Amino acid sequence: MDSLALIFIVVAVSDSYAIAGALSAVASVTMALATPHWSRVADRNGQSAMLVRVIPIKVTAFVAFTFLVLQETPTWTWFVSIIIAEAFSVNTGGLVRRRWLHILSPDKTTTDEDESDRHIVNTAYSFEALMDEVVFILGPIIVTACATSIAPAAGVISGIIFVVIGFPLFISAKETEPPPTPKRHVDPHPAVIRNKRVQAVVLATTLLGGFFGSIAIVTVAFTEARGHESQSGILLAIWALGSAVSAIINGVIKWKLPSAARFLIFLFALTVLSIPMLFAHSITWLAVALFFNGFAIAPLVI
């Protein structure tokens, strides 16, 4: 919701997709850098302790961003405020998946030892991916409806409202929260980022984040060029629907392939399924291309 809402308000005020795209890119990079840090803080201090410090700052910064854009202050102030806002972004999906692992395997941090455990966790993660896609289906529709029917800033404001309501509810679910794991004085394990496999995944997912961000701005520009800007949210919802369908399928399959092989397969599939979007010359054909492109997303991020 953030990136789409940002595009609507910035384009409405500045009439520049270049500025909107630059802001969206800066926001995505900042988020990518910030979320691992806050995930680590959540592991060390507990999720609730981290969230009660982070979320108020994020909300305040987004309110400031909205005010600065509407007041048409110098563009650099928009960048500063959005950097601050996204610097306090948290990986909500990661936090929830960590809770699933805690509930299903409370006495261990991994499920590699047990095949049945791996299938149960994969099913839980697939369910969570499905719920993510439900949000990604409804979110763009809500943001687009608010931004095009009420005011350009209404999309950002609706996102802020969801954060203000949702995170207190998430924090209150204490029974699912994993206990904090204080940092050892002498950690026998090397830093995860030093693992070459992790480095490869980080590089791929960083570029993947850029792909996701570009889809939002390109979709808005595509629909506006054809005089149907209000349909951009529906197109993004169709994209998420394709991912939701694949999340359901992925959840019922007992995969024999290792995770690394599946990651490469679905990364390749996403690349191939992105090609038809280059040849879509109507909203209908773009909707079809987005739907099938979404098929590769959920299995990839799971």
Residue positions per predicted region:
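Cytoplasmic membrane-interface "Motif A"-like loop-to-helix N-cap segments
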Residues: 44-57, 255-268
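C-terminal transmembrane helical hairpin of 12-TM major facilitator-type secondary transporters
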Residues: 260-301
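Transmembrane alpha-helix termini and helix-breaking/packing motifs in multi-pass membrane transporters
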Residues: 66, 138-159
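Cytoplasmic helix-loop-helix junction between adjacent transmembrane helices
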Residues: 81-134
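C-terminal ends and interior cores of transmembrane alpha-helices
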Residues: 56-73, 171, 269-281
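Helix-to-loop junctions at the C-terminal end of transmembrane segments
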Residues: 33-47, 147, 245-259
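Hydrophobic core of transmembrane alpha-helices in multi-pass small-molecule transporters
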Residues: 61, 74-92, 206-207, 286-299
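Helix-loop boundary and gating motifs at the non-cytosolic
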Residues: 1-32, 188-239
